[in-house]
């Protein structure tokens, strides 16, 4: 019997704010992880056992950014299916409002940076660039 294909589920946060009429997003610069260190990514992480997508995003935001998100303020804006990496990234958007993100995992994050959504740093992970492109076009699903 053929074994079922299994994917890891990842919740990524697209935190946005409006600065001088331009949409900005929060990026996290990786360090000491052994994977894509020195590159910017969206904050987030894998679901844990018995956790739903929103619970994972709320937990990850608290662990990585020190902020308390509410389920009703999160909206799924994109799903990326990685065939080769065997995972699915769910991108959840929230507006910054009065939240003040800060680096909580100093051993894994070198910097938090607000950037214009249409002017990402050169060293942004390729998957993030692709995801942002799809979100800007209003497309909910992509594969890589």
Q: Locations of the language-model features?
A:
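Conserved N-terminal beta-strand and adjoining loop/helix that marks the start
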Residues: 1-25, 77-79, 93
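A generic fold-level signal
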Residues: 5-8, 20, 34-35, 84-87, ...
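Active-site-adjacent beta-strand/loop module that shapes the phosphate/pyrophosphate-binding cleft
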Residues: 8, 17, 79-102, 113, ...
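Conserved Nudix-box catalytic region and its N-terminal flanking loop in Nudix hydrolases
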Residues: 22-63
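A short coil-to-beta-strand element that immediately follows conserved catalytic motifs
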Residues: 68-78
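NUDIX/MutT-family hydrolases
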Residues: 93, 103-136
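Acidic/histidine-enriched, glycine/proline-rich intrinsically disordered or flexible terminal extensions
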Residues: 137-144
């Amino acid at each position: 019997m053929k074994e079922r294909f299994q994917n890891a589920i990842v919740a990524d946060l697209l935190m946005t704010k409006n600065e001088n009429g331009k949409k900005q997003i929060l990026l996290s610069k990786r360090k000491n992880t052994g994977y894509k260190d020195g590159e910017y990514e969206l904050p987030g992480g894998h679901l844990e056992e018995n956790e739903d997508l929103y619970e994972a995003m709320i937990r990850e935001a608290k662990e990585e950014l020190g902020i308390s998100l509410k389920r009703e303020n999160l909206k799924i804006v994109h799903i990326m299916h990685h065939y080769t990496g065997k995972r699915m990234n769910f991108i959840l958007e929230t507006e910054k409002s009065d939240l003040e993100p800060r680096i909580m995992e100093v051993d894994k994050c070198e910097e938090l940076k607000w950037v214009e959504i249409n002017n990402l740093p050169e060293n942004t992970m390729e998957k993030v660039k692709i995801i942002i492109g799809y979100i800007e076009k209003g497309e909910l699903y992509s594969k890589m």
